Every structure is written in C-alpha cells, then in structure tokens.
A protein has these predicted regions:
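Karyopherin-beta/Importin-beta family HEAT-repeat alpha-solenoid scaffold
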Residues: 1-173
Length: 173
C-alpha cells in the first residue's frame, strides 16, 4: 500500500507523485480523499520519524489538492482542518531567536524552506483556495490562545496567521 511504501522508504517519490496527481488530475483522488488526508497529516505529525522536506511534501499534497479541487476538499474539511490548521500554526512558531536582530541594518529574508515560511505560505494558499467559511473558524480558535502565550514566537505566529489569511478570508473577517 501507499502508506506502507511511504513509511518504509527514504524515497519521496510517493508524495511527489501525489502532488503531480493533485495538480493534473485531482478528481482521480476523490475515492481516496480520506486516505490521502490521513496519510499526509500523519506524515506531517511525525517530526522525529521524517525529515522536514518530506513533511513539507505531505503538506504540499494537501495544499495543491485544495487549490485544484477546492469543492472536493471543502466537503471533507470538517474532518481534517481541525488537525491541519494547528499543524500549520505550529510550523509557524518554529522560529530562531536572533539576539542581534535589533541591531542589524538589514533584515535578512528567512529561508524559503523553513517551517515558518512553509507554514505561513500554506495557510495563505489554503485560505485563498477554500475561503473564510471553511478556514476562519479553525484559524481563529487556535490563534486566540497563541496571542495570549508569553512566548513571543507564538504571538508572532498568531499575528502572521491573521495577516496571511486576510486575502482568502477577507469577507468573513
């Protein structure tokens, strides 16, 4: 099975193939939508078992599927967004504290493949693809607690999440 292949291999071919299918023939995945979501969410959650790049590919499967078959994903969103959105927000908290930040003349862009950047851009893409009716409840529920956290990284991630989802959720906001 696909799950067995992914779990017992260091090869990302399965996830790359799922991304290609999601881009070019998303309807083909309709009968297996639950399996695809569960596989990708499980991969994303296993930080100790899989490298970041593989977890990012699993996320890309879900985001691409949401962009190319938004109606199909909206139908199952209630089952999975309560797990996916907190995962994205958790990725956005993965920031390094730079003690020299306040004295630098120029601000360096973060790496494009850092968890924080991938999480934020994925949240933006999901909000644009699925809209505020689908996404906003899940985002606000998690962001409210993040904004009250004493750790600056959580507050930063919460504010960035609101900013990132503004375009896709503007009618509901």
């Amino acid at each position: 099975t696909v799950t067995h292949s992914l779990a017992n291999s260091n090869d990302d071919t399965v996830l790359k193939a799922l991304i290609d299918i999601a881009e070019n023939a998303a309807k083909f995945l309709r009968p297996a939508i639950d399996e695809v979501f569960n596989l990708c969410l499980q991969t994303m959650q296993q930080k100790d078992e899989f490298e970041e790049s593989r977890r990012h590919l699993a996320l890309e499967v879900l985001v691409t599927l949401s962009e190319t078959a938004s109606a199909m994903v909206r139908k199952v969103a209630k089952k999975y967004m309560n797990r996916l959105v907190p995962q994205l927000l958790e990725m956005m908290v993965d920031l390094d504290d730079d003690p020299e930040w306040s004295i630098k003349d120029t601000i360096e862009d973060e790496e494009d493949d850092s968890n924080a950047v991938v999480g934020e851009s994925s949240l933006d893409r999901l909000a644009c693809a699925l809209g505020g009716k689908t996404m906003l409840t899940y985002i606000l529920t998690t962001v409210q607690t993040m904004l009250q956290n004493p750790d600056w990284r959580y507050r930063h991630a919460g504010l960035m999440a609101i900013s990132a989802t503004g375009e896709g959720c503007h009618k509901e906001m």
